[in-house]
Amino acid sequence: MSEIHVKTALSRLADKYLQNSKNPSVPYTIETIVSFFQEIIHSISPDTFQLDIDDILYKIYSKIPPEENNDALFSKLSNLVSRLKSQTVIHNKSQILYFLYLLSPISQSSRDVSSHLLDESISNPINIPSTEVESSNFGQTRYDQVPENPQITDWDEGLENESSISIAHDSSRLNRSTETSSVQHTLITEADLLSSISYVLQGISTEYVQFKNELALLSKRIPVQYLLQMRALSETGLLYQELKVFSNYDPSVSQSIDGDNVSKAFINDQSLALQSLKSVISKELTNFLALIASLDSQIRADASLEKPMVTIRRCIAWTQVAKLKLRILSSVVNDNMNQENKKRLIQVVSKYNVHGDPLIQELSDKILTEITGPLYEMIENWIYKGELVDPYQEFFVKEKNGSESHDHQGQGDVVWKGKYFLDKELIPSFLSEELVDKIFLIGKSLNFARYGCGDFDWAQEHYQKLVKKLSYRDPHSLETVVDKAYTESINHLVYLMEEVFHLTDHLKAIKKYLLLGQGDFVDLLMESLGNSLDQPANTLFRHNLTASLESAIRSSNASYEPEYVLKRLDARLLELSHGETGWDVFTLEYKVDSPINVIITPYCSRQYLKIFNFLWRLKRIEFALAHSWRRVNLGERNVFRNLDYTKFEWHFVSCHLAEMIHFVCQLQYYILFEVIEISWQELQLAMEKPNATLDTYIEAHEKYVTSITHKGLLGGGKSRNEDSFLHQLHDILKVILNFHDAIELLYNFSCSLSNRIRINVPISTDALAAQYTPIKNELSNFTEEFQVRLQKLLHGLASHKDPEMRFLSVRLNYNEFYVSHRRRHDKDVTSQ
């Protein structure tokens, strides 16, 4: 702008002032005021005009008294400054704004253009605000948020945003003197500050900036136009020092480092990922030092030039990218200080990878590539060898401590089901849940094949065939290797279970011999053991039971079973109790060992024992009823045909015996065909699926056993609960056995009476009635008790939520016999 234009603008400003003057009687002319304005302009230091508009605006804001309601003033001021910025014909906008600031009442160094001050101002040019105090006085600048809340929260606000790691500057804390000092001080120039920038960027104390712990103390001698710039550089130095202390921290050293708040948090929380992070930080700090060295050499070379090209503002611009990187690294470090994030460093860094800023994405990718190196090595050991190498417990696959003690319900061998588990909190976000499940299953399969099945050769072949270096930068290779390893390991494990360890053959053998599916074997065993099991339990010997078992095997189709099946079948006695018979303690067991016991677990074996005991008791009842039926039919034809005295009772017995046989046969049919066979078909379908795994086998077998115990009336409740179906069935079967014993008494009485009649022995009517009446009463009582208990069972089955249970109720009472019988009984009771 030419001198004429400047003078014209000042004249208009003076005229504007005179029009708005609060004291119009003062005889000042436009020329006098313009001369005053020119004196102000000439008295301003050239360095002052290097301030930009934002710095000057910040200074104006800081001078406005806070107790006033300044919202409207701030809004108006911002609007005017925006209009000033939009003027394209004005080039020296910042100088104009600073000049107007000096004229304003809020400027402590300005003079009011009024009354008696004007002459003094003209004769004594305006003083520039003092920028010097005693050299020992420093304004205190603090990183308040670094140790307390070090998260980078405002990345989207731009690179100049200072809110995340802020230097809290308080003008009252700086305590800059605005009064004219009687002692002349040396003015700090930009060249002086530039000479110390390389030290400030490293967090090293200088004459103008001192660093103490996490504090940066700025000298009050620093000119105001450089204050914000030096604060920005001091922030970079604090970031550098924080990261340097963290990267150099050695947990093996017991002594503490002053100000090392970050590193102290990691004394007992070292990990391979954390060590990799320290390596990344060390590399970035080395690059930053190279940048500082280049910057320092440029400053030194520029010092000899007449017109230096390097300024503090340019230094800030050149180090801005490096500063942002240091911010990100500091945020990562401080985020990981959270106790919940100690082992989740990869997850902490991963959230920066979805940021929209390319620089942040690039740095986070670089960090992730380094810190995921140990993770991918653990994955390689796991999917190639089935070995868990995790010295710092940071891998998402964990090994249970004391896993054997966790097998309270016998849920499987610890090699497969109780040894390893997934810690979902440690799963990185860039690995899908499906991929992690496959990785987990591959390692378990390899470990199980090696240590559970003893197949070391295949595990070595698997490693040599698939070995490939994995990394974060090549996720496709990881998916390809995992899919291939998953298919091979699962197929091989299924092959081992089926072909080498004969899993299906063992399940079929259990179905035949423990679930009484081999009819000829069961009948022969029942006949050979019948007389022995009638004896008291304490008179039985195991070798006698074993001999009967071997005899039944040789005499039935069981003799064609493979040797590895027959040698697992054994007879034994349960724990003896006083007064029990052999029927109460005899049982068959099928012994399984590793690795079959992973599927046929100890818990499942106990369930099989429970099922066998119930089916064996039901078979005993069937055997007893068949014997009673032969007694009735053969005796009626040969012995009791002409015996009128017991004819009515034998007819009564025949009717109710058929009723009990119907109940037992229908119950057996339901359990053997509707429950066991249907569940067996479902088990086979699950095991024959092309993608079936060992876990599929385990789940299918558990479902198979659970279905039998539940639908077979064995899992409706605790056995001691009077309302459970199992307890009711035991009571009904006990009544049937008592009825069978009463039939034996009636048969013996009838035979004795028939012989006495045949040989014409005198018979006393009273003596005969004394023997016969108790038998009649027992038969009647047992029959009535059977019907009452059966009706209660039918009522429970009919109201059960399971449709198959309701179907059993229909089978047992298909013609509503017990409903009509109950109506007749209630009618007879009412009539009496």
Swiss-Prot record:
Main location: cytoplasm
Gene Ontology CC annotation, any one: mitotic spindle pole body
Region described as Interaction with mzt1: 1-186
Keyword line: Cell cycle, Cell division, Cytoplasm, Cytoskeleton, Microtubule, Mitosis, Phosphoprotein
One Pfam family, short name: GCP_N_terminal
An individual GO BP term: mitotic cell cycle
Location(s) in or outside the cell: Cytoplasm, Cytoskeleton, Microtubule organizing center, Spindle pole body
Keyword Membrane in annotation: no
GO molecular function list: gamma-tubulin binding
Sites of Phosphothreonine modification: T286
Assembly and interaction partners: Part of the gamma-tubulin complex. Interacts directly with mzt1. Interacts with mto1. Interacts with mto2.
Family per record: Belongs to the TUBGCP family.
Function, in words: Component of the gamma tubule complex that is required for the regulation of both interphase microtubules and mitotic bipolar spindles.
Protein name: Spindle pole body component alp6
Lineage: Eukaryota, Fungi, Dikarya, Ascomycota, Taphrinomycotina
Gene that specifies this protein: alp6
